[in-house]
Design a protein with these regions (language model features):
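A short, aliphatic-rich alpha-helical micro-motif
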Residues: 34-36, 51-54, 179-184
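Rossmann-fold NAD(P)-dependent oxidoreductase module
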Residues: 18, 96, 100, 144, ...
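Short, structured coil segments at secondary-structure junctions
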Residues: 23-24, 55-56, 75-77, 152, ...
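Phosphate/diphosphate ligand-binding glycine-rich loop within oxidoreductases
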Residues: 39-112
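Phosphate-coordination loops involved in phosphoryl transfer and adenosine-cofactor binding
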Residues: 2, 78, 129-132
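Short, polar loop motifs at secondary-structure junctions
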Residues: 10-13, 31-33, 45-49, 64-68, ...
Length: 188
C-alpha cells in the first residue's frame, strides 16, 4: 500500500511520520510533481496537477471537514473523497464562535480601547433578544456552534440546504428560506 501526502499550507512531514508510525507496512511519501502513483492520499488544498497524476487513487482523505474545493477539481470518478466528520473541530469552532459573538455583544473592543486610552466609558447593557445569531450550515460543526450559542440564551437561527430540527434553534432550509434566514440575523 502506498500513501502519499499532499497538504498545501501545512507541513507534510508530521503527516508522513504519523502515518508511517501507524502503518509500518505501508510506503508513505510526500507528493512531488512526477511522483509515482499512490493507492491513497492525505490532502489539503491539492493542486489539479496532483489529481491529474494520481488518477488511480482509491481514496483521498481530506484533512479538514470542508471538501468544496476538492469537488471543484477534476478527480477520477473511482476516487472516493473522505472528509473529517469532526475530529474535535466542532468544540473548537463552538468556542471560537461563542467567543466572537460574546465579544461583539459585550462591546469588549470598546472597553479595551478605553483601557488603552486610560478612560472609562459607560455602555448600556444590551439585551440578548436584540442579538439574533445566524449559523450557516447545520452539519456536525454548525449544529455544535448553534447549540453552544443557545446556552448563552441568544436567539439562534440556522440555515442548511436540507431541513433540520435542533432544540432551541429556529431552522431554515433551502434557497426559498435563505433570505428570511439572513434578515432574521443581526450576527452571522
Amino acid at each position: 500500500m502506498h500513501i502519499t501526502v499532499c497538504v498545501s499550507q501545512q507541513k507534510p512531514e508530521p503527516w508522513q511520520q504519523g502515518l508511517q508510525a501507524a502503518l509500518p507496512e505501508a510506503t508513505v511519501s510526500v507528493w512531488q510533481p512526477g511522483a509515482p502513483a499512490a493507492d491513497f492520499a492525505v490532502v489539503w488544498a491539492p493542486p489539479q496537477t496532483f489529481f491529474d497524476e494520481q488518477a488511480g487513487l482509491k481514496a483521498a482523505f481530506n484533512t479538514g471537514a470542508g471538501v468544496d474545493a476538492l469537488l471543484k477539481l477534476r478527480i477520477a470518478p473511482t476516487t472516493r473523497i473522505v472528509r473529517l466528520d469532526d475530529a474535535g473541530m466542532s468544540v473548537q469552532m463552538a468556542e471560537f464562535a461563542c467567543h466572537a459573538v460574546i465579544r461583539h455583544f459585550r462591546e469588549l473592543d470598546g472597553y479595551e480601547a478605553d483601557v488603552r486610552a486610560g478612560r472609562w466609558s459607560y455602555r448600556k447593557p444590551r439585551a440578548r433578544a436584540d442579538y439574533p445569531v445566524g449559523v450557516m450550515g447545520l452539519g456536525v460543526l454548525g449544529e455544535r456552534v448553534a447549540r453552544a450559542l443557545t446556552v448563552f440564551e441568544f436567539p439562534v437561527h440556522g440555515w442548511s440546504r436540507s431541513p433540520k430540527a435542533i432544540d432551541g434553534v429556529r431552522c431554515h432550509a433551502g434557497e426559498a428560506q435563505f433570505d428570511a434566514f439572513l434578515s432574521s440575523c443581526r450576527v452571522l
